[in-house]
Amino acid sequence: VITAEFEDFFLVTVYTPNAQNHDENKRPKRLDYRTKEWDVDFLAHCKALEATKPVIFCGDLNVAHQEIDLTNPKPNRKNAGFTIEERARFDAILEAGFVDSFRQLYPDATERYSWWSYRAAARSRNIGWRLDYFCVSQALSPQIQDALILDQVLGSDHCPIALILR
């Protein structure tokens, strides 16, 4: 987590730890750490900052929030990044007053992904997940002009995303 303070807002960049697939109980190995510690602490950090001024946070949150945020939701329900617990923690972010900038503008957009496995030519077939986000404090949501997924940019299993504010 890197937090930068600007005159009118805080910008927080984050890599959220992957819950990792599966232990002997067929559940992600670090799911409890991810959902009961990391996600809780990260949201508390953002809310503490927000007490002073609005917050923008961005990065790899390692969760596909909705079924439309990945190609194959049904077979992935128990996999890291799409468990009920991880999705519920993203719900908590929204309930705490943060806005998923992409979904605010494109609530029904499908096949818009920011990550593709290196296996089985997933990227060329657009079999992916939307794991990367720009979330903003509710106070900033009217200023969202666009939220972009730059899926034509190569060089990683993730692609860049961008947020344009008025």
What are the residue ranges of the model-derived segments?
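Active-site regions of metal-assisted phosphoester/phosphodiester hydrolases
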Residues: 1-166
